[in-house]
């Protein structure tokens, strides 16, 4: 996985996607092959080297990550533990959309709100590799765009994001590279646009609908743009 990239992993339930994340995080040991982080076998890392500065994992249900009585206390504890100034903590709360529920108990949050709060806490650890298991679960379309902006910002600052997701549209629009996991192995991998444009099953609805008319159109915005452009060309030819 290239450093600084947003790497998405898709595949059917039970294919091994979440297991892969647990192996990268060092939570489980592979029975074949090996996991290397920056060229070094994960087993050679001391726990203090691995967590949280090298790897951080956001699970599907992050409720077990919370120990404080409010989101604010949770973020303040994370900021203090990792030497993050108060103003940076407030900025992280703002960009992750947590400010509206800072005083609430994490257990009282919706699934999407919990995801945001957990992501805010993990961002402050400044990991080199951020692992996300179904990060868009419970999120509305508007916040998915905000999440993508956050992840892209992390990548531009040198972090590597590896996300497992069933959200094909999200992966197609925002990931740099995408891999398909089947029966515990990577069956395909490539640049996101090429991956989804050349796939029959794991592709976007926009690509399925438009592939007879537009080659390599993957997202809704691309299809709309190409339709408008085609209409303009047709109208121009009639004139």
What are these model-derived regions, one by one?
Residues 185-209:
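Conserved beta-strand-loop-alpha-helix hinge in the C-terminal portion
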Residues 84-101:
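Conserved ABC ATPase "signature" region
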Residues 202-239:
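ABC ATPase nucleotide-binding domains
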Residues 25:
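Helix-to-loop junction immediately C-terminal to a conserved catalytic motif
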Residues 105-109, 113:
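Conserved ABC ATPase signature
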Residues 33-41, 51:
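Conserved ABC transporter NBD signature motif
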């Amino acid at each position: 996985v290239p450093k600084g990239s947003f790497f998405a992993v898709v595949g059917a339930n039970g294919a091994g996607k979440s297991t892969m994340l647990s192996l990268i995080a060092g939570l489980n040991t592979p029975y074949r092959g090996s996991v290397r982080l920056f060229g070094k076998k994960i087993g050679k890392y001391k726990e203090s080297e691995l967590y949280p500065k090298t790897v951080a994992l956001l699970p599907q249900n992050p409720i077990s990550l919370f120990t404080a009585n409010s989101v604010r206390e949770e973020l303040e504890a994370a900021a203090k533990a990792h030497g993050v100034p108060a103003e940076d903590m407030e900025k992280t709360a703002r960009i992750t959309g947590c400010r509206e529920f800072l005083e609430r108990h994490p257990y009282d949050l919706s699934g999407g709100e919990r995801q945001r709060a957990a992501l805010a806490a993990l961002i402050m650890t400044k990991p080199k590799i951020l692992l996300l298991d179904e990060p868009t679960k419970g999120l509305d379309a508007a916040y998915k765009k905000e999440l993508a902006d956050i992840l892209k910002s992390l990548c531009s600052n040198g972090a590597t994001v590896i996300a497992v997701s069933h959200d094909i549209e999200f992966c197609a629009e925002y990931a740099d590279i995408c891999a398909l996991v089947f029966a515990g192995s990577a069956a395909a991998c490539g640049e996101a646009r090429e991956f989804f444009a050349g796939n029959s099953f794991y592709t976007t609805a926009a690509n399925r609908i438009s592939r007879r008319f537009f080659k390599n159109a993957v997202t809704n915005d691309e299809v709309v743009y190409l339709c408008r452009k085609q209409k303009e060309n047709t109208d121009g030819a009639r004139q």
